[in-house]
Regions:
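Short beta-strand/loop motif that positions the catalytic acidic residue
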Residues: 153, 158-165
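C-terminal catalytic histidine-bearing segment of alpha/beta-hydrolase fold enzymes
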Residues: 186-263
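Short alpha-helix in the alpha/beta-hydrolase fold that links the catalytic acid
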Residues: 51, 169-179
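Gly/Ala-rich beta-loop-alpha elbow adjacent to hydrolase catalytic centers
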Residues: 116-121, 125
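Active-site nucleophile loop of the alpha/beta-hydrolase fold
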Residues: 139-146
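Alpha/beta-hydrolase active-site loop
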Residues: 87-107
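Short, surface-exposed "cap/lid" segments of acyl-processing enzymes
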Residues: 4-71
Length: 263
């Protein structure tokens, strides 16, 4: 157990000198209404070990810290996967994330889990959306490959994607959400104008969207009025709405009704 830009980190056990997956907790209350697992991005292939300071790992730190400040009983953990890449049929990130989910379920049995993943982490979240206790899949500029599984009934999927993403094209998220909606699933796509794959352009908006989606999706579990925020305010396409009003309205619509929305 070691400090890792969070409260503490738990490491998976692997034989020999193999890299270890680790779980860093940014919020670990004795009791939680909801548990959030934050998943970083990666590459198609690569056996370089992810380090605490790796850029793909560090990029998710602001999201985890913001989620840890959400009012209510929330637990937040960041997974650092062993390898940089997906690595073909081995699908290394899936093995690591299943281990992490076991740790979350052991600490908080029966509590709903939200998977928040960027790029490759978004792909992991979509793959594991049907894992026990997972209730929300929140993909940020997700990498989606042909034939990837989709979360099933009882899961809510919200994808957020920048329209300037040249790494993981926006159309992948659009196709996925269209497919889920056609199957009667709870799904939404929030398109972020003038933003890139790394979520550095309009970074503050990305962080706000992530925290608000989690708050609205788990309003009952968090014990607040998050589910009512903005409900009676301007709609998502109201030109008179302030930027804050529009974000609130878009999140409300995405979580409660689904569809394709723009910011």
């Amino acid at each position: 157990m070691s400090a890792a830009f969070g409260i503490k980190a738990d490491a998976a056990t692997h034989p020999g000198r193999m890299p270890l997956a680790s779980l860093a907790w940014d919020a670990r209350p004795a009791r939680a209404g909801v548990v959030v697992l934050v998943l970083h991005g990666g590459a198609i292939d690569g056996r370089q070990p992810n380090r605490v300071w790796s850029h793909n790992v560090i990029r998710m730190l602001p999201f985890a810290r913001a989620l840890a400040k959400v009012p209510g009983p929330i637990a937040v953990a960041r997974l650092r996967m062993r390898y940089r890449g997906w690595n073909g049929d081995e699908a290394s990130p899936l093995l690591d994330t299943r281990w992490a989910l076991q740790q979350l379920r052991a600490d908080y049995p029966g509590r709903p889990i939200a998977l928040v993943g960027h790029s490759m982490g978004g792909r992991v979240a979509l793959h594991l959306g049907d894992e026990p206790d997972v209730r929300l899949v929140l993909g940020l500029s997700p990498w989606i490959a042909k034939g990837d599984p989709r979360p099933g009934a009882g899961r809510r999927t919200v994808l957020i994607h920048g329209d300037r993403d040249v790494i993981c094209p926006l159309w992948g998220s659009r196709h996925t959400v269209d497919e889920l909606l056609a199957q009667g699933r709870e799904a939404a796509l929030i398109r972020v104008a003038r933003s890139d794959h790394a979520m550095l352009l309009r970074a503050g908006l990305w962080t706000k969207l992530v925290t608000e989606v989690v708050q609205v999706a788990f309003a009952d579990e968090l014990g607040g009025g998050a589910g009512d925020a903005g409900r009676d305010g301007p709609g998502p396409h109201d030109p008179a709405a302030t930027p804050v009003d529009r974000v609130d309205a878009v999140v409300q619509t995405a979580v409660q009704r689904g569809g394709i929305l723009d910011l």
